[in-house]
């Protein structure tokens, strides 16, 4: 009981943090218990105040001594200690916080539409992005900020090739085609950073409209590459569409009498991408295009092992 009376108050600690008296703050923390350290003062915890002031050593002392509820506290401004640390580029603090954040807090969206992931991408915190992505929900990964950015767009903007590769398979159709408030797409930004592997991956995933948007704002060399890639994919789509029409629509399902050809078609299908083929069939106004796609998917599922070995 006397120990509680003698220990410093949370308010004293926050005052030391506010004036950036790091040495004094550390002395106070050493004398305080979890209940006092976890209190809220003017809507913030001592941890959030310390993150805001960039006092990393103070944060390191606070994190293991605070309650789970206090660590996951959301301020009236819509920040958590993690989103704030990411926005300030405090990599070490983010690294300490991530394992302690609840699923709700790790996916938290701030008032300006950011997540810890979008901030980490913007601040070039590649390691933090890698830690966050497996822990986040699909919705949070695909979050669009108030500026029209996604984590993928920001990663491309910053030239984070590894993060782009991780994110691309996880993006929803709308998010991968997202255009920012400044008129950029992940593809235009990847092109600007000369991330050839990334914009090649994106071309196979993005809609024709989004690609055309990129063509109006990209460098000459990038335009040439994209146009060649689209042309190549269209040739593949055309050949595959013709073969599938003959196979699935010629005489019904029984017309599939050449298994090797179908395996080859599956290989083309994997290269061309389901979405691109669908768009091609619709553009060409092919009858029963939905049926063709469904039958191709069924064939791949049925013979996935053989396709994997041959393709």
Swiss-Prot record:
It comes from the Bacteria. Disulfide bonds: none annotated. SUPFAM superfamilies: Ankyrin repeat. Coiled coil: none annotated. One of its GO terms (cellular component) is cytoplasm. The keyword Repeat applies. Pfam families: Ank_2 (PF12796). PROSITE patterns: ANK_REP_REGION. SMART domains: ANK. Keywords: ANK repeat, Repeat. ANK repeats lie at residues 42-71, 77-106, 112-141, 147-176, 182-213. The keyword Repeat applies. Gene3D superfamilies: Ankyrin repeat-containing domain. PANTHER family: ANKYRIN REPEAT AND PROTEIN KINASE DOMAIN-CONTAINING PROTEIN (PTHR24198), ANKYRIN REPEAT-CONTAINING PROTEIN-RELATED (PTHR24198:SF165). This is Putative ankyrin repeat protein RF_0923. It comes from Rickettsia felis (strain ATCC VR-1525 / URRWXCal2). The lineage of its organism: Bacteria, Pseudomonadati, Pseudomonadota, Alphaproteobacteria, Rickettsiales.
């Amino acid at each position: 009981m006397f120990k509680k009376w003698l220990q410093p108050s949370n308010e004293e600690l926050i005052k030391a943090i506010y004036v950036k008296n790091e040495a004094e703050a550390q002395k106070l923390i050493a004398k305080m218990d979890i209940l006092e350290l976890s209190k809220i003062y003017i809507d913030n915890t001592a941890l959030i105040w310390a993150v805001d002031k960039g006092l990393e050593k103070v944060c390191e002392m606070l994190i293991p001594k605070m309650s789970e509820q206090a660590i996951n506290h959301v301020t009236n401004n819509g920040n958590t200690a993690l989103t704030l640390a990411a926005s300030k580029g405090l990599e070490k603090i983010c690294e300490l916080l991530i394992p302690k954040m609840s699923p709700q807090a790790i996916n938290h969206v701030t008032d300006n539409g950011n997540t810890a992931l979008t901030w980490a991408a913007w601040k070039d915190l590649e390691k933090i992005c890698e830690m966050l992505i497996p822990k986040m929900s699909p919705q949070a990964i695909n979050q669009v900020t108030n500026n029209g950015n996604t984590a993928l767009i920001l990663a491309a903007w910053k030239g984070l090739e590894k993060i782009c590769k991780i994110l691309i398979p996880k993006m929803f159709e709308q998010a991968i085609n997202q255009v920012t408030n400044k008129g950029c797409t992940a593809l235009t930004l990847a092109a600007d950073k000369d991330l050839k592997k990334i914009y090649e991956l994106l071309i196979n995933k993005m809609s024709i409209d989004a690609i055309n948007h990129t063509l109006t704002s990209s460098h000459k060399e990038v335009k040439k590459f994209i146009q060649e890639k689209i042309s190549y994919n269209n040739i593949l789509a055309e050949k595959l569409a013709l073969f599938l029409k003959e196979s699935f629509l010629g005489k019904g399902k029984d017309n599939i009498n050449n298994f090797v050809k179908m395996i080859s078609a599956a290989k083309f299908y994997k290269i061309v991408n389901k979405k691109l083929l669908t768009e091609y069939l619709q553009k060409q106004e092919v009858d029963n295009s939905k049926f063709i796609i469904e039958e191709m998917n069924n064939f791949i599922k049925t013979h996935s092992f053989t396709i994997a070995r041959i393709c």
